[in-house]
Amino acid sequence: ICTNNCAGYKGCNYACPLNDHPIAYKSCEGEFDPKSKCPR
């Protein structure tokens, strides 16, 4: 389930955190998007 974990951070809306990489985020399509990074 994808939810907005980075409200207020540009490019981080509707991202899924990766359990093995808390700073990196996956897009809701399920593919890693290097642009969708934000603080936890």
Curated annotation (Swiss-Prot):
SS bond list: 2-16, 6-28, 12-38
GO cellular component: extracellular region
An annotated Gene Ontology molecular function: serine-type endopeptidase inhibitor activity
Subcellular location: Secreted
Function as written in the Swiss-Prot or TrEMBL entry: Inhibits chymotrypsin and subtilisin strongly.
Family: Belongs to the protease inhibitor I20 (potato type II proteinase inhibitor) family.
Entry protein name: Proteinase inhibitor IIB
Organism per entry: Solanum tuberosum (Potato)
Lineage of the organism: Eukaryota, Viridiplantae, Streptophyta, Embryophyta, Tracheophyta
